[in-house]
């Protein structure tokens, strides 16, 4: 019954793939009270998720007893569809910053979101303007020109370095960071971990890139982050700072 509703809005093939991954998860770990509570949380929020794989509900579940509700979403898209922060902001009182360089989404973000929008591409260092490649309907866009994106256009956008974006943040100032830029997520994470800011929750896309995946995992684990529920979302990682959650596995 749980699997009948889980991601029920997704295509059947994708839904079965996700269910298979989740069954594998249940075979390899002991189902503790925490995991049972998470499943119940998903049931209560059925139909209210805007994320691709319920990432927003995971954040709400982990942060349900937190008083601080701040986010930064890097790679926002139109601000609503498959956004990891729209639900947090629109229905749960979260505040934050959005970083999205794709000019196709500027009007939509301004109309649908109250969070501050930085129209620039996040980079590891200050390099001025960068070439930005857009894919079909602008959904997939990247600083990298790769065969995985059917490029229709490219143009130059402003860049903003990690040091400038996170420079004023103290260690505990940011509750949630979402990073999905179809490119150098590993380099961004490594650079971020050199700074004082250590978000409580980090959701970062790896998109099955083995080198990128390894670099992300190593960097975050070295900084006391715990990887959770890996089999639920295969395309990205859900990390929580170890001092912000107590899971028994």
Which residues make up each language-model segment?
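Phosphate/nucleotide-binding beta-alpha loop and adjacent structural elements of enzyme active sites
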Residues: 2-249
């Amino acid at each position: 019954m749980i699997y009948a509703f889980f991601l029920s809005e997704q295509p059947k093939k994708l839904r079965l793939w996700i269910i298979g991954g989740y069954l594998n998860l249940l075979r390899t770990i002991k189902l503790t009270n925490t995991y049972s509570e998470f499943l119940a949380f998903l049931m209560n929020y059925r139909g209210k998720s805007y994320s691709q794989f319920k990432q927003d509900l995971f954040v709400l579940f982990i942060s349900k007893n937190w008083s601080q509700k701040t986010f930064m979403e890097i790679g926002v898209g139109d601000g609503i569809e498959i956004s990891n922060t729209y639900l947090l902001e629109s229905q749960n009182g979260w505040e934050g910053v959005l970083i999205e360089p794709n000019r196709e989404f500027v009007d939509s973000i301004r109309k649908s979101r109250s969070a501050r929008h930085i129209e620039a591409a996040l980079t590891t260092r200050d390099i001025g303007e960068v070439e930005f490649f857009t894919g079909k309907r602008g959904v997939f866009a990247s600083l990298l020109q790769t065969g995985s994106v059917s490029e229709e256009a490219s143009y130059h956008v402003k860049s903003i370095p990690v040091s400038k974006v996170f420079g004023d943040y103290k260690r505990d100032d940011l509750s949630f960071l979402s990073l999905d830029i179809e490119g150098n997520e590993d380099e961004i994470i490594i650079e971020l971990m050199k700074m004082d800011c250590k978000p409580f929750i980090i959701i970062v896309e790896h998109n099955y890139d083995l080198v990128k995946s390894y670099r992300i995992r190593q960097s975050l684990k070295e900084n006391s982050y715990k990887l959770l529920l890996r089999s639920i979302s295969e395309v990205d990682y859900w990390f929580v700072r170890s001092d912000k959650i107590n899971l028994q596995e």
